[in-house]
Amino acid sequence: MRKTINSNKLQFDTVRFCTSSDNISLIEGKEHLFKHTLDMETGELSIIEFNSQANQNNRALVPFSLYIHANRQSKRMTIEFSSKLLLEDYPLLISEDTFLQALRNIERLGICKLNVEAIIEDCSFNKLHATKDVDMELTESILDTLNLCTGDYRRYNWKRYMGESICFKKDVKTKDCQEELNIYNKEVEILTGKNKPFLKMVSNPTEIMAHYEKKTRFELKMGTKRMIMKKLKISDTSYYNVMRGNPNILLEQFDCIFTPSANSNAADTSLINGFTDYTLFCTLCFHKFNLKTIEQDIKDRRLYGPNSRCALGRAMNKVKSMAHAWNKQSTNANSIIEEIREKLESKSMNLQG
């Protein structure tokens, strides 16, 4: 059967939302799956909680992220899960088309019963990982280009992880202003040890693994209501507002972080034209082309006085120009950035399953 992933709709790998605790009921004989907390004064049941990572039995039943916390006194319930809750339809991700299916799978797994229609009406989201999988092999050349095309290297921290992944974080302390974009090789990630129990659980592991061949995942993490409203351009985080929010969120975030080579004329001449250019290039190589590390090293060595910010800025502009020139000559950075932008703009793709 062939299913279509509508990329014009928002898709999420992880969601967390609040709803009424009246929307949950336990399944007879499965009450032990939940942790029960009693009110110390009244002796009445106050809180029930399910955490798929709490113990070995829960992990065997649900080998992926699922968290349910219902407070009977405050009448509030928090539910968080990953798109693996879609089971065989995992590649479809969480969207307006699959959200109800994910909720119903909680009962299918024998955990509890949920009033899914009521949840749709009253839920509000406070955590989302906006996600898109694109047909692109995440090569070393692409990773190097992304490192060097960070428009404002002071604004975003980046780090490589798992060999074929890169994470960009906005360098701020305020939680509502924090931004995190992860780009990684999904074909490699789906085969890691943490995903093996999930693949054993579903009936179509071969199809799921085949779907992610030569796929790169782009994932924007949003951890507060204010951030969600800002990025999705919505007035609140109710169900329909979120699911029908800004469909270009990942493209816009990509454009916020990455720019084409800022000094294209520099690549039209020889890269090294003297000893000064040579020392700049050696400095870049020593620090693996991490501009932020270079700037911090200059500060640590006190090469410029506290009143010489302009001089430091001029020096860093020379370093940055050399980095962009090298990047364009060696990787054709502009075409790589534009190719990624086009893929993030693509409308739909087919899923064989």
Where are these regions (language model features)?
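Short, solvent-exposed alpha-helical "recognition" segments
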Residues: 317-332
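Helix-turn-helix DNA-binding segment
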Residues: 306-316
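Structured, helix-rich domain cores that form ligand/interaction pockets
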Residues: 1-300, 328-353
